[in-house]
Amino acid sequence: EIYSSKSSYYDWAKIRFTSQFRPKLSLKKKDPATIQLGYDGTLEDVFTGFVSGNYDGGTYANEVALKDEMLLMEETIINDTFLDTTPQELISYFLAQAGLSKMKLSSKTYPTRKMLPIRRQTAVQAINAVNAAWGLRVPFFFSGGVFYWDEKPEQKKVYTFERGVNILNLRRAGGVWELETVSAPFIKHSHKINLIHPQVSGEVEVSKVVSK
C-alpha cells in the first residue's frame, strides 16, 4: 500500500508479506527502499524512501513500514540563529543538514530577513517556521527523491482516463472526485490528468494517489 498526497508532508508505504518470508527479512531503520510498478518489463519508481523502524524477521510482524525522505528531515534538529537570509537559503541549509541535496525551490524573490532564531526544531518544523516568518502558505514535499518547495514535479505527458477504457469507478466523496483505475505508476500527486466521463470531463489536478 502506498499513500501520496499534496496535503501530507511525507509519502508512506506498507509492505505486507506471508509468514514464509518473515524469517528471511531483517531491516534496519533508515535502510533505503524503493517500490516499483509497471507493465511489460518497464518499471516506474512509485516510492523512494527509507524503512521507518527496525524490523527483525524473528518477530510476529508481517508488515514493513516505509517513509520518504521527510523521515530524515524529521530526525534533523536545527538550533541556530540565522542572519540576513532568504527562505531559499534557509531551506537549502536545512536539507544539507539532513544530508539531502536534490531540491527544486521557488525562484520567487523574497525580502531578506535580518534575524530568525530557530531553537531545537526538526527540519520540518523549521521549514514551517520559515513559511510563518515570511507569511507564506506554500506546499513542500518530496517526490522521486527531490524536495519541492512551492514547486511541482515536472510532467512530460498528460494521461487520459476514459469511462469504459481505463476508469473502473468514479465517484464524488467529501467534495472531491475519486477515480479508481488499474495501476498507474506514472501518475504522481500534483500532476494533471485528462478525464473523459459523463459526470466530469476535462483537465484536473491530482491531489492524492493511493496504490493497493
Residue map of PLM features:
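Short beta-strands and strand-coil junctions in structured, solvent-facing domains, enriched
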Residues: 22-24, 72, 101, 135-139, ...
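Glycine-rich, acidic and aromatic/proline-enriched surface loops and short helix-turn segments
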Residues: 87-103
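Short, surface-exposed ligand-recognition loops at beta-strand->loop->(often short) alpha-helix junctions
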Residues: 81-85, 182-185
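An acidic/polar, Gly/Ser/Thr-rich interaction patch typically located in mid-to-C-terminal regions
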Residues: 2-23, 149-212
